[in-house]
Amino acid sequence: VKVTVDRDSVAMGDDTESHERTLDVPGETTLGAFLAHLTPEVSVAGSATWVVRLGGRDGEWVGMYDGQMRVLREAERTLTDLGVTGIHFDYWAGAPAELLLESLAAGRLPAKDALQREGWRRGWQVEDDRARAKAATTTRRLLSAEAVAAVAALGGRIEVHAPSYCRLVGADGTTYVVTADQHWSRVSTVDEAGDRQGLGTFRPPGPLAETTLVARLGATWRATRGLDPVEPPRHRTTVSRSGGIWRWTFTDGGVEHEGRYWPDGTLAAAFAPYARLEVPEITALFTVGDAR
């Protein structure tokens, strides 16, 4: 029999070419024996968990692949008996393999989104634990001294602070996580379930992200105190939309600075006016109201 093997795309640009391949297989081959030699044939950074389905993307599941093929249904039946014409690798990015295996072994396909969120939460907790441990071994910190002072002045508190990671709580109880790598800084909020929601992404990494963070902390600080919102500063940075992403950009000293926001233009428009200000200016704007 001829069996078409396909898989989901795993990243942007991965869908520019077809992943399909067609194999000639003796019909008396059992499903278990056939699948034992199959892989998605793609390298994925981090957790790479797949649900293996008969037919297409919406076909019946028969097992999973996480570096090891696990056939959990119909393993002893032949391809001819099952009428197999296709195998699809359904990509479950971030899903913990052990939880997926536990559910499938019990005969249940779990909700994909819920399992992925659990995987991300576990990963974020590991990141937080590592940052806490790192902070105990070094005096280097992600946020500038000015941003640390702003957090305190605006009713917040820093709970974990390491060289590339900071978790803090604002005056209204909202938890924020700020991270940085060699290319970008990222600011996220964390909900009660432990899920992160991206607030903005910034380049170059460093103080640029602090402008949005401190402006957000300032706005919530005033709201908790029953104060009127401040008038945004006159330093305007143009907001535009490209490729489904709302952003602002400006060039300073020959270096392009950029802030990206999701899911719409509301956040980009709200925080663009602060992008060219220094953190102490933003703090003063919200606490004193005299920075222009």
List where the protein language model places each region.
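Short gly/acidic/polar-rich coil/turn motifs that serve as flexible hinges in modular proteins
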Residues: 27-29
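Intrinsically disordered, low-complexity, charge-dense segments enriched in Lys/Arg
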Residues: 78-83, 90-96, 101-124, 128, ...
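A short, exposed loop/beta-hairpin motif centered on an aromatic-Gly-Thr core
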Residues: 20-24, 194-205, 257-260
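Short aromatic-glycine-(Arg/Gly/Cys) micro-motifs in beta-strand/loop hairpins
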Residues: 1, 171-198
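An exposed acidic His-Trp-rich patch
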Residues: 49-70, 218-243
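N-terminal "first-domain core" detector
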Residues: 129-177
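Ubiquitin system architectures
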Residues: 5-23, 32-130
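Long, charged/polar, surface-exposed segments that mediate recognition or autoinhibition
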Residues: 197-227
